[in-house]
Amino acid sequence: MNKTLNQKAWFFVIPVFVLVAFNAVVPLMTVVNYSFQETFGSNVFAWEGTRWFKEILHSERFHASLGRQFIFTFIILLIQLPLGIGIALTMPKKGWGVPVCLILMSMPLLIPWNVVGAMWNIFALPEIGFLGNTLNSIGFDYNFTQQSGDAWFTTILMDVWHWTSLVVLLSYAGLNSIQPAYYQAAEIDGASRWDIFRYIEIPKMKKVLTLAILLRFMDSFMIYTEPFVLTGGGPGNATNFLSLDLVKMALGQFDLGPAAAMSLIYFLIVLLVCWIFYSIMMKDEGRV
C-alpha cells in the first residue's frame, strides 16, 4: 500500500522537477557554456577557456562594482535588522491593533520593484518631489541625480522603506512563538526589559533572524530593478552595483562571454557567503 502511494506521489512530483530543471538548470548550463567561449553571432563560437574569468577577476570595473555591492548590503543589514526588530517589539500581540499593524507592514512588500523605483524617483526629485523639495527648503543642497552621496542616501532610504517590513514580520513571528512561561519566570526573577530581550527574546529568535539575514543579504546583494529605475547606476557610476554592471555588459555592450563569467562569479559569491554565514550560525546553535 505504501509503495503504491509513493509511486503515485512521484507521479505528481516529476512534473515539478522537470519544470525546475527547465527554468534553472538549462539556463545555468547555457551561461556556463557562454563563459568559456566567444560568440560571433549566428551560433558561431570560439573556445576561450578561462580567459573571461581571468579578465573579470583582474578588472578594476568589476572590483569597483563588487565593492559598491558589498558596501550597500552591509549598510542595509546594519539599518534594517535593528530597525525591524525594534518595530516588531513595539507591535501589539493581541487586540484589533494586530491585523492593522500586519496589514500596514505588508503593504510595502506587495508593491512591484519597478513601481517602487518610479515612486521614489518622483518622491526624491529635487524640485517637485516631496523629499527633495523638503530637504532643499531646510538648507540641504540635495540632488540625487547629480550628487553621488545623495544618490546613495536615496537608494538606501528606498530599500529600507521597501524591505524593512520583511524583517519586522519575521521578527514579530519569532516573538510570538516564545512561550509565555519564559516571560513569567523572568518577571518572578525581577529581570529588566533589557535582560528579557538579551537572554530570552534574542536567543529564541535566532533561527528567524538567521532567515531574515540570509534573505536580506541575498535580496540586497542582487538588487537591480529599484536602483535601475531610480538612478540608472548614476550619477556617473556612483550606484552602479554589480547587478547593474552585469546587465550593462551583457545587454548594453553585448559582451556575452565576459558577462557570463561575471554572472557565474556573482552566483558563486552569493552561494559562498550564504553557506559561510549559515554554517557559522548552525555551529553556534549546536554549542547552545
What does each model-found stretch correspond to?
Residues 2-288:
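A structural signal for multi-pass alpha-helical bundles of membrane permease subunits
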